[in-house]
UniProtKB/Swiss-Prot annotation:
Description of post-translational modifications: Autophosphorylated on Tyr and Thr residues.
Glycosylation: residue positions: 32, 96, 112, 156, 212, 227, 257, 362, 373, 461, 532, 558, 638, 722, 743
GO cellular component, as recorded: plasma membrane
Residue numbers bearing the Phosphothreonine modification: 847, 855
Name recorded for this polypeptide: Receptor-like protein kinase BRI1-like 3
Motif stretch (Cys pair 1): 65-72
Modified residues (Phosphotyrosine): 931, 1028
Region forming the signal peptide: 1-23
Positions in the Extracellular compartment: 24-772
Native organism taxonomy: Eukaryota, Viridiplantae, Streptophyta, Embryophyta, Tracheophyta
Active site per the UniProt annotation: 985 (proton acceptor)
Keyword match Metal-binding: no
Tissue/organ expression: Predominantly expressed in vascular tissues. Expressed only during postembryonic development with a very discrete pattern of expression, preferentially in the two protophloem cell files at the elongation zone of the root. The expression in these two cell files attenuates as the phloem cells differentiate in the upper root. In cotyledons and leaves, it is expressed in phloem cells, starting at the cotyledons and shoot apex, moving toward the basal part of the leaves, where the expression is weak. Expressed in the secondary and tertiary veins and in the upper part of the cotyledons and leaves.
Length: 1164
């Protein structure tokens, strides 16, 4: 309180003493500067954890020029303030600093300032302002600075969260500004046509990259731009098929970056490029350009140093005219459809080229030996083409001192041996020749390259072994990836000298001998893969010393001894980062014992997905799933191992209790060993576990009840042990197939036969010799009599039940059979009175027979819908209540898991915008799901069959309510459920409408849990429904939350247009709703997309166009540009002044709890 009064008095003193009624200065300038700096500290700094401003103390004799970050002029006035990377947090009130009349430079980047008040300053003398890398959100600060600080030369607002529309440019009074950086914010909407032209002619550098601004590029005006040298619009949503004419006015332009937008058509040709006489860097990468590279582009060759056209759909080859590009140093044409011989005819003549990137094209033939003429070449990437022949041997000839650092020719069709001449490339750091057909030894000269850090040659037919001299002369090697070859011999002890090693992958070779204990000295080692070899001996306990080890795969060897408890010694201590950002693919084995181990991790840089799908480790297993992406750590500083596979060895002893402390472990496979003892109760600490395989051992005792709390567990196998007792009820343990518990004679309970209800056997006691024989005989007679009575009663009851069963079966046989699929009950041993497992109390006495009766034997008359995973029937129960029953189709090897996954996904989730699962039933091969019945059926039916007799017309108010409800339900699945849920088949037929027309998201038949293992979900077939499938699914087959967002965008577009996603009569055979709408939207004809029946509504078309814009963002072809469903809800909230009943967007809250229950009476 005392400090607050002191601050108030200080502010009043500054206000009163600075200027008297006649304008005379009564307080010295230096005191005024001190007061303003102190006011800034008091009002803007809420947290200073490192005491960065510790010496900022106000008082008599305090000189601010001695304060940290403050610089002063010779007369003691504050002219500069540099607080960059100070760890400061607070609300930035910029006017306290702009009031410093002599302040010329202000650097606050790298802190955590949020937006504050910046509207009341009377002036600003700043010349340099850097507020980058903070948490600013209010874009009005940009307008304030542009209109107030008239002496600005450089301003940087990059890497904040500034949102809204780009509005004003600097005032015309500002004649000095040269640099403006607004990159990596959240600016959106269409960029004003004159935004760039309105900048003063002094402007040299303008960076708008990393936002979401839209508009037709050809309509932008660049004005005179006579001094503009750097312009970037990269990573936005700019469209158009032409360049603006006024851009050619920028004669001094040196860097033009338009990458990662939606520019279409062909790259401009003619004489357009001849206007740029100083252009050094041009990037048109990752747009939608097609056709051939125009020869006229070579008009830039006199000055061009960097050209990036990657990530388009360009065809043909590099024109011959590019041989004149004598200044070109970096050329990136990767990820196109180029072909031809331009490498030898054009590229080999570019003498100054240093970086050449051509991966993922269609270039065939031999790798031209003429490329060795490029003596300055540092990086050569020819991965994923169609090259044949041998690896050229002349890159590092004796005549030239090669500077080659990276040689990447993975995923081609090269044969022959690895050239020994590569050993002369003394600058070589990375060699990747993976996925070819190379044979022979790896030359010893390569192993001794002084700078070699990455040796990657997996998936070849290489022979020989790892030399004893590895890393003897230095430990620069970081990645050694030689899996899936024919390597022999043992691992040398000298591998312990590779002190920088991060990733060792030698799986699937012919290695023998023991694992060197010295590997435990590799503190940086993160991934060790030695599976599928013939290694012997014990698992070294020293591996527990590897402080960064997160992935250990030793499966399918001949290892013996006990499980080392030391493997868990780093639990809670592992630090992230050592292999972050590396491209990988994980091939998960889901085919049981036909393929050994849980799967295989492979380096995936430069490999086509379709090539991997045909790799033996994939197609030789009955069922596999491929996960791919970038390595990311899920912890900050308290991590543990995430993958441990020691299966198919001869390891014995008990399972160490400490393994349960590995809280981030996702896969633990100890199956097919000789383990004894019990399953540790500490396994309840494996909170992230997704796969747990303890099968084919000699484990005894009970299944720990703690396993029931493992909410991420998606695959459990404890079969072929000696386990006893009941399977713990609760969690997911009862949802796994019977085979996962098989051959444990003492186990019982769901899904195995029920446990005996009789009393447990008691111990026998010896009777005294003198015990009365008569007493024993009497007891025997009484016992026999009781047994006879009980037997008679049991026979009577059994006869009564049998009679009742026959009556019910006779009735059921009289029912018509389903017209959709045949029933498979002939071999069913369960009685038809088997109970339906339910999640709702009112249904707890429901049986399978009741369901048969309620649906008239699942007759065609009762069927109300059909989906990709089964038919849906309407069932009226005996009490008059109505439910919907989905009868899942049977898919070999998948039906049970789809059924179990759906139960676990839906059964524990309650939300007013989700269709609740009431119960389930499994009998024979039939799988049934019982849902709450939705009165008005699907949105698809209501929306697109409104013209039929009795159809319902949805006005805009109803459609808006449905759009918001469906978004809320999907956002709940994506963000609130633990684990998160990806729908995978979001469409209008899966949005159901209840009696109040509230939207309910349904049909999780294709859903998968995003567990710790399933960060990206890969499937063997394309997920989703045509018309709703995002474009990236056709390339990667990976299902993501952003894919669901795209599908939701289609639903929103349906609501706005009233049109079906696919309608050949409306859009033609080669187009659909999305393509049609995008074309109109690009042409500024968005109003033509809207359903005419909606435009006449009282809301008008303005609000509709806002919703259309949200749909457009959801339908962006680039997943990273799409909003999350939370952001969609936020945009709805900004648009809607919610006055409809029970539809408050303000109360949309996310509850991150393992089991999410939300009352339907409570507003989300």
């Amino acid at each position: 309180m005392k400090q607050q009064w002191q601050f108030l008095i200080l502010c009043l003193l500054v206000l009163f003493l600075t200027v008297d009624s006649r304008g005379r200065r009564l307080l010295s300038d230096d005191v005024n500067d001190t007061a303003l700096l102190t006011a800034f500290k008091q009002t803007s700094i809420k947290s200073d954890p490192t005491n960065f401003l510790g010496n900022w103390r106000y008082g008599s004799g305090r000189d601010p020029c001695t304060w940290r970050g403050v610089s002063c002029s010779s007369d003691g006035r504050v002219i500069g303030l540099d607080l960059r990377n100070g760890g400061l947090t607070g609300t930035l009130n910029l006017n306290n600093l702009t009031a410093l009349s002599n302040l010329r430079s202000l650097y606050l980047q790298g802190n955590n300032f949020s937006s504050g008040d910046s509207s009341s300053s009377s002036g600003c003398s700043l010349e340099v302002l850097d507020l980058s890398s903070n948490s600013l959100t209010d874009s009005s600060i940009v307008d304030y600075v542009f209109s107030t600080c008239l002496n600005l030369v450089s301003v940087n607002f990059s890497h904040n969260k500034l949102a809204g529309k780009l509005k004003s440019s600097p005032s015309a009074s500002n004649k000095r500004i040269t640099t403006v950086d607004l990159s990596n914010n959240r600016f959106s909407d269409e960029i004003p046509e004159t935004f760039i032209a309105d900048f003063p002619n002094s402007l040299k550098h303008l960076d708008l990259s990393g936002n979401n601004v839209t508009g037709d590029f050809s309509r932008l005006s660049f004005g005179l731009c006579e001094n503009l040298t750097v312009f970037s619009l990269s990573q936005n949503s700019i469209s158009g098929d032409r360049f603006p004419v006024s851009l050619s006015n920028c004669k001094l332009l040196e860097t033009l970056n338009l990458s990662r937008n939606s520019l279409i058509g062909k790259i401009p040709g003619d004489d357009y490029w001849g206007n740029f006489q100083n252009l050094r860097q041009l990037s048109l990468a990752h747009n939608l350009y097609s056709g051939e590279i125009p020869p006229e582009l070579s008009l830039l060759c006199r000055t061009l140093e960097v050209l990036d056209l990657s990530g388009n759909s360009l065809t043909g080859q590099l024109p011959q005219s590019f041989t004149s590009c004598g200044s070109l140093q970096s050329l990136n044409l990767g990820n196109n459809k180029l072909s031809g011989d331009f490498l030898s005819t054009v590229v080999s003549k570019l003498s100054r080229i240093t970086n050449l990137y051509l991966p993922f094209n269609n270039i065939s033939g031999s790798v031209p030996i003429s490329l060795t003429n490029c003596s300055n070449l540092r990086v050569l990437d020819l991965s994923s083409n169609e090259f044949t022949g041998e690896v050229p041997s002349g890159f590092c000839s004796l005549q030239s001192s090669s500077v080659l650092e990276k040689l990447l020719i993975a995923n081609n069709y090269l044969s022959g041996t690895v050239p020994v001449e590569l050993g002369k490339c003394k600058s070589l750091k990375t060699i990747d020749l993976s996925f070819n057909a190379l044979t022979g030894l790896i030359p010893k000269e390569i192993w001794t390259l002084p700078k070699l850090s990455d040796l990657v040659m997996w998936a070849n037919n290489l022979t020989g072994g790892i030399p004893e001299s590895i890393c003897v002369d230095g430990g620069n090697l970081e990645t050694l990836i030689l899996n899936n070859n024919l390597l022999t011999g043992s691992l040398p002890e000298s591998i312990s000298k590779c002190t920088n090693m991060l990733w060792i992958s030698l799986s699937s070779n012919l290695l023998t001998g023991e694992i060197p204990v010295g590997i435990g000295k590799l503190e940086k080692l993160a991934i060790l893969q030695l599976g599928n070899n013939s290694l012997t001996g014990n698992i070294p306990s020293e591996l527990g010393n590897c402080k960064n080890l997160i992935w250990l795969d030793l499966n399918s060897n001949n290892l013996t001894g006990n499980l080392p408890g030391e493997l868990a010694s780093q639990a809670g201590l592992v630090m992230p980062g050592s292999v972050s950002g590396k491209q990988f693919a994980f091939v998960r084995n889901e085919g049981g014992t036909d393929c050994r181990g849980a799967g295989g991790l492979v380096e995936f840089e430069g490999i086509r997905a379709e090539r991997l799908e045909h790799f033996p480790m994939v197609h030789s297993c009955p069922k596999t799933r491929i996960y791919s992406g970038m390595t990311m750590y899920m912890f900050s500083s308290n991590g543990s191992m995430i993958y441990l596979d020691l299966s198919y060895n001869a390891v014995s002893g008990s399972i160490p209790l400490g393994y349960g402390a590995m809280g981030y472990l996702q896969v633990l496979n100890l199956g097919h060993n000789l383990l004894t003892g019990t399953i540790p109760d500490s396994f309840g600490g494996l909170k992230a576990i997704g796969v747990l395989d303890l099968s084919h051992n000699d484990l005894q005792g009970f299944l720990p009840g703690s396993l029931g709390g493992l909410s991420f567990l998606s695959d459990l196998d404890v079969s072929n042990n000696n386990l006893t007792g009941p399977i713990p009820f609760g969690g997911q343990l009862t949802t796994f197939p019977l085979t996962r518990y098989a051959n444990n004679s003492g186990l019982c309970g769901v899904p195995l036969p029920p446990c005996s209800s009789g009393s447990r056997p008691t111990r026998s006691h010896a009777h005294p010799k003198k015990q009365s024989i008569a007493t024993g005989m009497s007891a025997g007679i009484v016992f026999s009599f009781m047994c006879i009575v009980m037997l008679i009663m049991a026979l009577y009851r059994a006869r009564k039940v049998q009679k009742k069963e026959k009556q019910r079966e006779k009735y059921i046989e009289s029912l018509p059979t389903s017209g959709s699929s045949s029933w498979k009950l002939s071999s069913v041993h369960e009685p038809l009175s088997i109970n339906v497992a339910t999640f709702e109390k009112p249904l707890r006495k429901l049986t399978f027979a009741h369901l048969l009766e309620a649906t008239n034997g699942f007759s065609a008359d009762s069927m109300i819908g059909s989906g990709g995973f089964g038919d849906v029937y309407k069932a009226k129960l005996a009490d008059g209540s109505v439910v919907a029953i989905k009868k899942l189709i049977q898919v070999t090897g998948q039906g049970d898991r789809e059924f179990m996954a759906e139960m676990e996904t839906i059964g524990k989730i309650k939300h007013r915008n989700l269709v609740p699962l009431l119960g389930y039933c499994k009998i024979g091969e039939e799988r049934l799901l019982v849902y709450e019945y939705m009165k008005y059926g699907s949105l698809e039916t209501v929306l697109h069959e409104k013209t039929k007799k009795g159809g319902i017309f949805l006005d805009w108010s109803a459609r808006k309510k449905i759009a918001i409800g469906a978004a809320r339900g999907l956002a709940f699945l994506h963000h609130s459920c633990i684990p998160h849920i990806i729908h995978r088949d979001m469409k209008s037929s899966n949005v159901l409408l209840d009696q109040d027309f509230v939207a309910r998201v349904s049909d999780f038949g294709m859903a998968r849990l995003v567990s710790a293992l399933d960060t990206h979900l890969s499937v063997s077939t394309l997920a989703g429904t045509p018309g709703y499938v995002p474009p990236e699914y056709y390339q990667s087959f990976r299902c993501t939350a952003k894919g669901d967002v795209y599908s939701y965008g289609v639903i929103l577009l349906e609501l706005l247009s009233g049109k079906k996603p696919i309608d050949p009569e409306e859009f033609g055979e080669d187009n659909n709703l999305v393509g049609w709408a995008k074309q109109l939207y690009r042409e500024k004809r968005g109003a033509e997309i809207l359903d005419p029946e909606l435009v006449t509504d009282k809301s008008g078309d303005v609000e509709l166009l806002h919703y259309l814009k949200i749909a457009s963002q959801c339908l962006d072809d680039r997943p990273f540009k799409r909003p999350t469903m939370i952001q969609v809800m936020t945009m709805f909230k900004e648009l809607v002044q919610v006055d409809t009943e029970n539809d408050s967007l303000d109360e949309f809250l996310l509850k991150e709890t393992p089991l999410v229950e939300e009352s339907r009476d409570k507003e989300p």
